[in-house]
């Protein structure tokens, strides 16, 4: 059985894939990106080539190169590098899984295939099992995101007996708002040392109460420090302070969601906050508008995300 060097927990940044204005991958800034996550945001785990990283818009060759660059630049700086290897083609997923093992990644994750879909738990398990077997020494994580895949198999059902079929299974990236399903995943697997990683950033505090051991998300690229403060407050059982942090984070997310928020806008915000050029997304996504970026910048400033000083006073009205 594959065991991680240590349990994947805490914040995991779903990394963006930087691109040039011509739509080519800009590998030159990934080293700077690593340093920014570690030093400025306090985030030392990453999830590469997922939704935020436009993994399914990249060629297999590009996905391999991106994975290699993150592993290389993250050596001795990052704690864990998880590579998403999901694809519509089983063979491509297996190739990417094997490659992740060869380059020294710390784990692999896979979404359900979403064009010709698996409609039952057993069919999905059979697909995941074949991918996991291509990297038998790596911890395996299932990436549950039914809103995008259209695969509605409940995670609770999937986890029932999963170690019998996939002995390298180590956890779940749960990117759904169904807290009943998530809670039952935790409750029914208390004897296992699974990593339960929540993937809806604006609801993280609720998931922590339900037993989440960590979180994977796009906002941890630029709100990692703030979210870590929420985690610290929660761990210290200062639930009022933790709630204040969550509400403040929600204010920003709620604001940008109303403007239209996705991968393109995440790239624009990350460029704004970090100073590292993330570039445009790849087609069919469109570059975020100047109006969006200006509005997001104004909201960040109004929320005083640089200090959070008023949160300790429980001031939930500031910056609204």
UniProtKB/Swiss-Prot annotation:
List the catalysed reactions: aceneuramate = aldehydo-N-acetyl-D-mannosamine + pyruvate
Question: Tissue range of expression?
Answer: Isoform 2 is expressed in placenta, liver, kidney, pancreas, spleen, thymus, ovary, small intestine and peripheral blood leukocyte.
Class of the enzyme per the UniProt entry, highest EC level: lyase
| Molecular functions (GO terms) | identical protein binding; N-acetylneuraminate lyase activity
Provide the function of this protein: Catalyzes the cleavage of N-acetylneuraminic acid (sialic acid) to form pyruvate and N-acetylmannosamine via a Schiff base intermediate. It prevents sialic acids from being recycled and returning to the cell surface. Involved in the N-glycolylneuraminic acid (Neu5Gc) degradation pathway. Although human is not able to catalyze formation of Neu5Gc due to the inactive CMAHP enzyme, Neu5Gc is present in food and must be degraded.
Q: Which UniProt keywords apply?
A: Carbohydrate metabolism, Cytoplasm, Lyase, Schiff base
Indicate which residues the UniProt annotation says bind aceneuramate: 51-52, 175, 199, 201-202, 218
Q: In which pathway does it act?
A: Amino-sugar metabolism; N-acetylneuraminate degradation
EC number(s) per UniProt?
4.1.3.3
Originating gene: NPL
* SMART domains assigned to the protein according to its UniProt record, in alphabetical order: DHDPS
Q: What superkingdom heads the lineage? A: Eukaryota
Quote the protein name from its UniProt record. Answer: N-acetylneuraminate lyase
What is the species listed in this Swiss-Prot or TrEMBL entry? Homo sapiens (Human)
Question: Might you name a Gene Ontology BP term for this protein?
Answer: carbohydrate metabolic process
Q: How does it assemble?
A: Homotetramer.
- Entry's SUPFAM superfamilies? Aldolase
Catalytic residue positions: 143, 173
| Cellular component annotations (GO), alphabetically ordered | cytosol
Has UniProt tagged this entry with the keyword GTP-binding?
no
Look up keyword Cytoplasm and say if it applies: yes
InterPro entries for the chain: Aldolase_TIM, DapA-like, NanA
What family is reported?
A: Belongs to the DapA family. NanA subfamily.
Q: Name where it's found.
A: Cytoplasm
